[in-house]
Regions:
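Alpha-helical substrate-binding/gating segment
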Residues: 116-119, 138-160, 167-190
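Short-chain dehydrogenase/reductase
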Residues: 33, 82-90, 126-138, 168-169
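Active-site Tyr-X1-5-Lys
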Residues: 66-68, 82-119, 138-148
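A short helix-coil junction within the Rossmann-fold of NAD(P)-dependent oxidoreductases
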Residues: 20-24, 46-54, 99, 185-186
């Protein structure tokens, strides 16, 4: 509410606000459901009161669960999630679908992506976690700058040539550009 009051010309919102550690979501499901769903509901309510009609939701490929085949396409079924974090993304997407049906003036883009990595050269966009990182790239970065001696690779029984896991990554700068493009598309009342 405060941000909309201070900046009354806001025409779009990008929803990044969420807890995002998959492992932690398994041990703290109530916190994940409360935070991740409530953030979206509050934002949508404030947007409605300020006549803001463009919403980009930072979803996740976790909505697809553990698909039987790859590559995953946008029309794959969602909902068979394997953790509470993924389920919060599915529930939020469903909430947005319902709100759009009730309010045709609301334009929503759901962006489902895999593992954001990297940083902007300014250092303003990217991950430099406090404590133990939740994903691989912060470990690689720590090795690169000499804060860590080596990266440990866990798992050797995956169905890959060397037995290690395969991941899909997207650079944070590309991700930021994609979100800006989504806003521009929504603002044309697509």
């Amino acid at each position: 509410e405060h941000i909309f009051s201070e900046c009354p010309d806001i025409t779009a919102v990008i929803q990044f606000a969420a807890y995002k550690a998959v492992g932690e979501s398994v041990s703290k499901p109530i916190e994940y459901y409360y935070n991740n769903l409530n953030c979206t509901l509050v934002i949508l309510d404030v947007m409605r009161h300020h006549n803001c009609h463009n919403f980009v939701f930072s979803s996740s490929a976790t909505v697809y669960g553990d698909p039987a085949s790859v590559p995953i396409t946008e029309d794959f079924p969602t909902g068979a999630t394997t953790n509470p974090y993924g389920t919060t993304k599915v529930f939020t997407e469903r909430i947005l679908q319902d709100v759009c049906k009730a309010d045709p003036s609301l334009n929503v883009a759901l962006l489902r992506y895999f593992n954001p990595i990297g940083a902007h050269k300014s250092g303003l966009i990217g991950e430099d976690p406090n404590g133990i990182p939740n994903n691989l790239m912060p470990y690689i970065a720590k090795v690169a700058v000499g804060k860590l001696e080596k990266v440990h690779v866990f798992g050797n029984d995956y169905p890959t040539p060397d037995g290690t896991g395969v991941r899909d990554y997207i650079h944070v700068v590309d991700l930021a550009r994609g979100h800006v493009c989504a806003i521009k598309k929504l603002e044309t009342n697509c």
